[in-house]
Amino acid sequence: MVSVTELLDDPAINAYILRMIGEEGIELLRRFPEGGEHSDEELAEMTGVNLNTVRHTLYTLYERRLAEYRRLKNTETGWLTYLWHLRLDRVHDVLEEQVRDALEHLDARLAYEEKNDFYMCRNCSVVYTFTDAANWNFECPNCEEMLEHFDNELIAVALRKRIDRIKESLGSA
């Protein structure tokens, strides 16, 4: 299994995790004890990271399947203790899944751009589909200026380039 340090040394993974949990979260990962399970309070004490930050980081990682917990109930008090461990071995799969989701959204946006004809109000800078523009007799509903045809080819070209780059990075071009 790859260590946290090795994972964080990868610029793409570091950027992804940094965006997800911030600098303090990264600091928690760097100081996270290897092996075993630890409560959020133990982690805060062992790492010197604020307890609220520890909890927020763990929940965020859990939402992405990069951390797991086991729940223990104290039979005397009824209190629950959550014992956490990292699952950063899943980071590549999680990243790929998110890239595929982004690709799906970009494909849908490209289809929308290619399927529709657009009109724009130069005064308000609002873009409308042909259907909406026709419903308003090609007058802006905000300022009543005439709508002009909007050429969205640059948007479509940019979307195609981005889609091609993503597919290439996924090995499915």
From Swiss-Prot:
Disulfide bonds: none annotated. Keywords: DNA-binding, Transcription, Transcription regulation. The keyword Transcription applies. Residues 9-92 form the HTH TFE/IIEalpha-type domain. InterPro entries: TF_E_archaea, TFE, TFIIE/TFIIEa_HTH, TFIIE_asu, TFIIEa/SarR/Rpc3_HTH_dom, WH-like_DNA-bd_sf, WH_DNA-bd_sf. GO terms for biological process: regulation of DNA-templated transcription; transcription initiation at RNA polymerase II promoter. It comes from the Archaea. GO terms for molecular function: DNA binding. The keyword ATP-binding does not apply. SMART domains: TFIIE. Gene3D superfamilies: Winged helix-like DNA-binding domain superfamily/Winged helix DNA-binding domain. Belongs to the TFE family. The winged helix domain is involved in binding to DNA in the preinitiation complex. Monomer. Interaction with RNA polymerase subunits RpoF and RpoE is necessary for Tfe stimulatory transcription activity. Able to interact with Tbp and RNA polymerase in the absence of DNA promoter. Interacts both with the preinitiation and elongation complexes. Transcription factor that plays a role in the activation of archaeal genes transcribed by RNA polymerase. Facilitates transcription initiation by enhancing TATA-box recognition by TATA-box-binding protein (Tbp), and transcription factor B (Tfb) and RNA polymerase recruitment. Not absolutely required for transcription in vitro, but particularly important in cases where Tbp or Tfb function is not optimal. It dynamically alters the nucleic acid-binding properties of RNA polymerases by stabilizing the initiation complex and destabilizing elongation complexes. This is Transcription factor E. The lineage of its organism: Archaea, Methanobacteriati, Methanobacteriota, Stenosarchaea group, Methanomicrobia. The gene is tfe.
